[in-house]
Amino acid sequence: SGIGEIAAAAASQLLISVYECEMIINYGIVGGLTPEMSLAKTCVVEKVVHYDFNLKFDNDMNPVYKKGEYPDFDGEIFVELDRTLIEIALKSVPELKRVTCASADKFVDTDDERKSLHDEFGADICEMELGAIAITCKRNGVPCLSLKSVSDAIGEDYDFKAMTRIASDACVKVLVDILKTL
């Protein structure tokens, strides 16, 4: 789809509308928000928050929505991914960690930002596409699965380009194992 929420939403809607996809499987690299989310750790996302969406006040400046909440989400800020697909993924690759993802059109590159996302949303990882993909799938009634591998971790020095390749390879290996069972 390319980088960012807009490209991801457009690609997801195209796949659903034109190709009538029965499910969307998203995979890619992410930033780790906790020490447990170490470099190349691969995980399955249970829920995602699109944290830069903000309709906090109405025209009279009264609080209306929580940060990350969409008007049609019934008070929820998280979009749940498909439980059946998550269970299939975990049966195929039991060592996958279930995680919460924070998603926005923003590259998070400081430990302070990472800590803030973890503290505010309980997120384990962050990235720039899944919020849009999950929302598009939810609105179209299409199941969604997301697999992510950590390319940059909190408090670690690394060669980003090298870690991107290592994390990508780790994620693809898990994806292939899961696809064999679908």
PLM features: residue spans?
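N-terminal catalytic or cofactor-binding beta/alpha core of small enzyme domains
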Residues: S1-L55
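Short, well-ordered amphipathic alpha-helical segments that serve as non-catalytic structural scaffolds
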Residues: A11, L15, T84, I88, ...
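Short loop/turn motifs at secondary-structure junctions
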Residues: E20, S38, K97, G122, ...
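Short, hinge-like loop/turn segments at secondary-structure boundaries
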Residues: T42-V44, C144, M163-R165
